[in-house]
Amino acid sequence: MTTTKIKTQWACSECGSYSPKWLGQCPGCFQWNTLVEEIHSSKLKTSSYPLSSTTPVPLNTVKFQEEIRISTRSKGWNRLLGGGTVCGSLTLLGGEPGIGKSTLLLQISSQFAEQGYKVLYVCGEESVSQTSLRAQRLQISSSNIFLFPETNLEDIKQQISDLAPDILIIDSIQIIFSPSLSSAPGSVAQVRETTAELMHIAKQKQITTFIIGHVTKSGEIAGPRILEHLVDTVLYFEGNAHTNYRMIRSVKNRFGPTNELLILSMQTDGLHEVENPSGFFLQEKVVETTGSTIIPIVEGSETLLVEVQALVSSSPFSNPVRKTSGFDPNRFSLLLAVLEKRANVKLYTSDVFLSIAGGLKITQPSADLGAVLSVVSSLYNRYLPKNYTYTGEIGLGGEIRHVTHIEHRIKESIIMGFKGIVMPSGQIKGLPKEYLDQIDIIGVKTIKDAVRLLQ
């Protein structure tokens, strides 16, 4: 009589790498306390995927076929995905619990259903009545949306075969399990295998699939890193529970540009696209105040204006405080060091706080100039030129370096009615004459030149 040998392995919940024994730190991604136990059978496992019968073909003989895309009423959603949702694609939507992922996909499902597409919504985390109540609140009622409260992957595959949907939504991948695996739902093996199975179904049957995934405390999608490599598109749902706006950012897209940004407003009847993001973020700006600048930032094909606020106060302690919100703290420390060294602005006895108004997170270096001038304005309690925007990267030598998409930043400043823009002097030459006629452009070469703008 033969017995099946059981083998224990430890898998990292962050990157999916394996270790034969428990380790405090993952050898793959170097994260701490991420290894979880998994039990594997030595019994030979056969793949459930059919063997491929295709043969290699020369590259120059392949005929290009344009992807078939499904458009919705939301222009922002279509832009986010590169011109519409590609048929047969697999999209991963990640976000914190309660931020509105299910609400968003239910609204998108309604727009698909309006066009006659059949939608299978697998609501594994909620009952049919709970999902139906949400649909009523969103004023959604369609005979083309089918709710299926199931977590067993085999039952889901059977319903896909019977119903033949055009759109499949999995809410959420962390609760779906395959009975062929002994590990618990949400484990590394379950998330990896169920996603791979769904990807195969999406490609084989040309079913457009959306998967909801929860994020960890660090803001990354929970589960192995390979999850993001398997799917075609990765969208991050960002926002704050204390504000009524949400942002969706595309960090991966095989069928379109990345780093696209969609800003939504959460209201009682669901999520609504914000058509004027710059006006949305500047609507609460105080007209006359020190320590405040407006900077133009570019997110994908979208340009928007946001406010940078700084507060500098004397510190009673030997180690002054440096705090940021929405701005890279390491980058901020570097900018303060350059400010002291190259512009002789003394901050070693002051607490310095910097915030991006509205809760946005900015990583692009074009925000350097606005951040530094906000700090200096607050320190000296002096005003900067009124109705100007500021853009420029600051180097370690104190020089103001070029930024990308400068024409887009100038154009957005003109549209929003600003009087002028402060920018790197080296980029003024070559600008279209129409911009020079519509807005006052001030060029700065160094950080010292920028500080002299203070009244």
UniProtKB/Swiss-Prot annotation:
Region annotated Lon-protease-like, chain positions: 351-455
UniProt motif RadA KNRFG motif: location: 252-256
InterPro entries: AAA+_ATPase (IPR003593), DNA_repair_RadA (IPR004504), Lon_proteolytic (IPR008269), P-loop_NTPase (IPR027417), RecA_ATP-bd (IPR020588), Ribosomal_Su5_D2-typ_SF (IPR020568), Ribsml_uS5_D2-typ_fold_subgr (IPR014721), Rubredoxin_2 (IPR041166)
GO molecular function: ATP binding; ATP hydrolysis activity; ATP-dependent DNA damage sensor activity; ATP-dependent peptidase activity; damaged DNA binding; serine-type endopeptidase activity; zinc ion binding
GO biological-process terms attached to the record: proteolysis; recombinational repair
EC number: 3.6.4.-
Binding-site positions, ATP: G95, E96, P97, G98, I99, G100, K101, S102
UniProt keywords, alphabetically: ATP-binding, DNA damage, DNA repair, DNA-binding, Hydrolase, Metal-binding, Nucleotide-binding, Stress response, Zinc, Zinc-finger
Any single Gene Ontology cellular-component annotation: cytosol
Residue intervals of every C4-type zinc finger in the record: 12-29
Pfam family, one: Lon_C
SMART domains given in the database record: AAA
Function: DNA-dependent ATPase involved in processing of recombination intermediates, plays a role in repairing DNA breaks. Stimulates the branch migration of RecA-mediated strand transfer reactions, allowing the 3' invading strand to extend heteroduplex DNA faster. Binds ssDNA in the presence of ADP but not other nucleotides, has ATPase activity that is stimulated by ssDNA and various branched DNA structures, but inhibited by SSB. Does not have RecA's homology-searching function.
NCBIfam families: sms
Family, similarity comment: Belongs to the RecA family. RadA subfamily.
Entry-linked PANTHER family: DNA REPAIR PROTEIN RADA, DNA REPAIR PROTEIN RADA-LIKE PROTEIN
Domain writeup: Has a putative N-terminal zinc-finger, a middle region with homology to RecA with ATPase motifs including the RadA KNRFG motif, while the C-terminus is homologous to Lon protease.
UniProt-recorded name of the protein: DNA repair protein RadA
Native source species: Chlamydia muridarum (strain MoPn / Nigg)
UniProt lineage: Bacteria, Pseudomonadati, Chlamydiota, Chlamydiia, Chlamydiales
Gene name linked to the record: radA
